[in-house]
Curated annotation (Swiss-Prot):
Binding residue positions for Zn(2+): H153
Name of the protein in question: Intermediate capsid protein VP6
Family: Belongs to the rotavirus VP6 family.
Matching Gene3D superfamilies: 2.60.120.170, Viral capsid alpha domain
UniProt source species: Rotavirus A (strain RVA/Human/United States/D/1974/G1P1A[8]) (RV-A)
Length: 397
């Protein structure tokens, strides 16, 4: 994997910097590195593809070295270099696609394709190593079963979940109380509602709770907490739990009271915030617990009082909500990230070449299914294919 990254980094630099008119002295070190790559690769043969519709291709390396010059690089020099660069880039692209198409239930973090396994051989250690990539660094650690640490922005840590729980219900569905939520990606939105606006609750206060367990622990997370859940702020028709009927939800938004958010790790509270909105920090957690209240307003203007009558029918439904959004966090496991294209790149390659469903990844690389059942085998394979995708993205956009 390190060799693949070093090859890609060298090729990217060569493609960007070996251009007509450049002083040789400005790129002499790069050209020496490029020549070392050629010397190491010459005489070797590789094969890629042969899975799904990814065609089998054979690769032979027999290239001349780039020479020295006292002046600027001329058109012939650059054209000669370009021919070599383009062949190498095509090779790297196919090695990456071959690797992204494969998976293994055992030791899935290790190279799976024939070509990448061959590049891991001792003879290729002479290629200049550049391990500055976060993914390469963490792949090395994971490969040695040591602690990794990926920094994600907008991590897709929450499997998609949209549902409701009714704490008070009746066949007519005309006086309901409960919670509804939408968890997806890096965001939780939860709303507590009471058709009667807590008129019969103790002290006219309804208490709500929403607990979300993460599939992997996060550390040093920057989080935004808002006293609103905009996705539940407009009328809607909702299917009943048994699917036998539908019920009408017509929210009127109130501000939540006594809001508390707890971040827990292995059942122990690590951080707690009360009535604090905006940016908050969570040190280490695998569970989020949200507590909030709906309080019937003690004083109401006639217009507000008309919204919340003392008895049925209740045409407007008192609702309070919260939004919790993870802006950035560190995770020991690799995750999809809304700010990265790695999952999209891997999925696109597997779809384009009709890669058959294997023993590890779900059909279509369904992220909700993948993260819901995030096994060690999936984690290993995902770290490998994301590392390869990050390498490929240097050369192929």
């Amino acid at each position: 994997m390190e060799v693949l990254y070093s090859l890609s980094k060298t090729l990217k630099d060569a493609r960007d910097k070996i251009v007509e008119g450049t002083l040789y002295s400005n790129v002499s070190d790069l050209i020496q590195q490029f020549n070392q790559m050629i010397v190491t690769m010459n005489g070797n043969n590789f094969q890629t593809g042969g899975i799904g519709n990814l065609p089998v291709r054979n690769w032979t390396f027999d290239f001349g070295l780039l020479g020295t010059t006292l002046l600027n690089l001329d058109a012939n020099y650059v054209e000669n270099a370009r021919t070599t660069i383009e062949y190498f880039i095509d090779f790297i692209d196919n090695v990456c696609m071959d690797e992204m198409a494969r998976e293994s239930q055992r030791n899935g973090v290790a190279p799976q394709s024939e070509a990448l396994r061959k590049l891991a051989g001792i003879k290729f250690k002479r290629i200049n190593f550049d391990n500055s990539s976060e993914y390469i660094e963490n792949w090395n650690l994971q490969n040695r079963r040591q602690r990794t640490g990926f920094v994600f922005h907008k991590p897709n840590i929450f499997p998609y979940s949209a549902s409701f729980t009714l704490n008070r219900s009746q066949p007519m569905h005309d006086n309901l109380m409960g919670t509804m939520w939408l968890n997806a990606g890096s965001e939780i939105q939860v709303a507590g509602f009471d058709y009667s606006c807590a008129i019969n609750a103790p002290a006219n206060i309804q208490q709500f709770e929403h607990i979300v367990q993460l599939r992997r622990a996060l550390t040093t997370a920057t989080i935004t907490l808002l006293p609103d859940a905009e996705r539940f702020s407009f009328p809607r028709v909702i299917n009943s739990a048994d699917g036998a009927t539908t019920w009408f939800f017509n929210p009127v938004i109130l501000r939540p009271n006594n809001v508390e958010v707890e971040f827990l790790l292995n059942g122990q509270i690590i951080n707690t915030y009360q009535a604090r909105f905006g940016t908050i920090i969570a040190r280490n957690f695998d569970t989020i617990r949200l507590l909030f209240q709906l309080m019937r307003p003690p004083n109401m203007t006639p217009a507000v009082n008309a919204l919340f009558p003392q008895a049925q029918p209740f045409q407007h439904h008192a609702t309070v909500g919260l939004t919790l959004r993870i802006e950035s966090a560190v995770c020991e496991s690799v995750l999809a990230d809304a700010n990265e294209t790695l999952l999209a790149n891997v999925t696109a390659v597997r779809q384009e070449y009709a890669i058959p469903v294997g023993p590890v990844f779900p059909p279509g690389m369904n992220w909700t299914e993948l993260i819901t059942n995030y096994s060690p085998s999936r984690e290993d394979n995902l770290q490998r294919v994301f590392t390869v995708a990050s390498i490929r993205s240097m050369l192929i956009k």
